[in-house]
């Protein structure tokens, strides 16, 4: 790996396990304010994670996972993501994700006053993140 001194520690923790912990050169993911890419020596900050694809770059190696919700703490030499749910492509059931996508789309189309539209939109985003992660 070229220029190891440009790496930082990425740690991703879920309620069930340490999902990932290693030195990386960049991590990209969605926040409620848009997509971000983090390199070493980034200014310290905290962010709320939004559903989408998390991309981990380690030298020439790139890994992706479906990240659904959580919080991120960014320090100059370490990024910690506290994730409610995150899945590698091999852990995703595509047919289940496609079914969830269809259900969420139907709920959004119906405009039923009893439907929590924010919840339906989040369900749709999570399903799309799962599907796109597997198909990348």
Give the location of each predicted region.
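Short, charged, intrinsically disordered terminal tails
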Residues: 1-7
């Amino acid at each position: 790996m070229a220029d190891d001194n440009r790496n930082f520690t990425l740690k991703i923790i879920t309620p069930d396990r340490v999902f990932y912990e290693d030195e990386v050169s960049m991590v990209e993911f969605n926040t409620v304010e848009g997509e971000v890419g983090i390199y070493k020596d980034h200014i310290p900050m905290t962010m709320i994670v939004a559903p989408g694809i998390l991309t981990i770059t380690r030298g020439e190696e790139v890994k992706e996972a479906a990240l659904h919700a959580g919080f991120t703490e960014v320090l100059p030499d370490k990024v910690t993501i506290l994730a409610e749910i995150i899945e590698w492509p091999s852990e995703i059931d595509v047919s289940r994700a496609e079914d969830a996508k269809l259900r969420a789309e139907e709920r959004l189309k119906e405009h039923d006053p009893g439907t929590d539209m924010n919840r339906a939109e989040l369900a749709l985003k999570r399903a799309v993140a799962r599907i796109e992660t597997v198909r990348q």
